[in-house]
């Protein structure tokens, strides 16, 4: 198990205008940790999606919501936890409601919802959801792509 070097916590009002603050702080942290430009862009998109999901769904426009973004910096990875204490949801029920997306499906005809989490899972190396008081999304990105391959081998054997 990797040893955590630093933890940075950011408290954001659950308002759309603060999503960029989470993205900007992440960019600086990931750059300092040694991530490539491409990996930083993936991280920024994933974290923006997670924060936006909290703003849009957990608090539904209420003014008093708060989102916590934690950056856990390890020697080989960055773990980002986006948590809210708003309205929770059941992922499996939500997946059934929106149904699967088909290859070649017309983008203009796609249903609204569900793409944010799909995008996060696509861009990150590991994603976990926790339903405590609200929802927490824990996203992990390894600095070295070989680490992802090594972890995959150890899991499959």
Curated annotation (Swiss-Prot):
Q: What is this protein called?
A: Serine-protein kinase RsbW
Summarize the protein's role. Negative regulator of sigma-B activity. Phosphorylates and inactivates its specific antagonist protein, RsbV. Upon phosphorylation of RsbV, RsbW is released and binds to sigma-B, thereby blocking its ability to form an RNA polymerase holoenzyme (E-sigma-B).
Listed under catalytic activity are: L-seryl-[protein] + ATP = O-phospho-L-seryl-[protein] + ADP + H(+); L-threonyl-[protein] + ATP = O-phospho-L-threonyl-[protein] + ADP + H(+)
Task: Report the sequence similarity comment from the record.
Answer: Belongs to the anti-sigma-factor family.
GO molecular function terms noted in the UniProt entry = ATP binding; protein serine kinase activity; protein serine/threonine kinase activity; sigma factor antagonist activity
Entry keyword Transferase: yes
Give the source's domain of life in one word: Bacteria
Q: Which InterPro entries match?
A: Anti-sigma-factor_SerPK, HATPase_C_sf, RsbW
Q: Which UniProt keywords apply?
A: ATP-binding, Kinase, Nucleotide-binding, Serine/threonine-protein kinase, Transferase
Q: Return the Pfam families for the record.
A: HATPase_c_2
Source species, please? Listeria innocua serovar 6a (strain ATCC BAA-680 / CLIP 11262)
Tell me its EC number(s), please: 2.7.11.1
Q: Does the keyword Metal-binding apply?
A: no
């Amino acid at each position: 198990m990797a040893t955590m070097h630093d933890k940075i916590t950011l408290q954001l009002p659950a308002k759309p205008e603060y999503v960029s603050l989470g993205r900007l702080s992440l960019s600086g942290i990931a750059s300092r940790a040694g991530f490539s430009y491409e990996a930083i862009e993936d991280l920024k998109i994933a974290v923006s999606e997670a924060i936006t999901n909290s703003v849009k769904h957990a608090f539904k426009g209420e003014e008093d919501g708060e989102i916590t973004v934690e950056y856990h910096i390890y020697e080989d990875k960055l773990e980002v936890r986006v948590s809210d204490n708003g309205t929770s949801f059941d992922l499996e029920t939500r997946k059934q409601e929106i149904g699967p997306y088909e290859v070649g499906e017309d983008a203009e005809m796609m249903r609204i919802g569900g793409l944010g989490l799909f995008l996060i899972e696509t861009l990150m190396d590991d994603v976990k959801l926790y339903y405590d008081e609200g929802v927490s999304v824990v996203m992990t990105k390894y600095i070295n792509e070989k680490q992802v391959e090594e972890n995959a081998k150890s899991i499959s054997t």
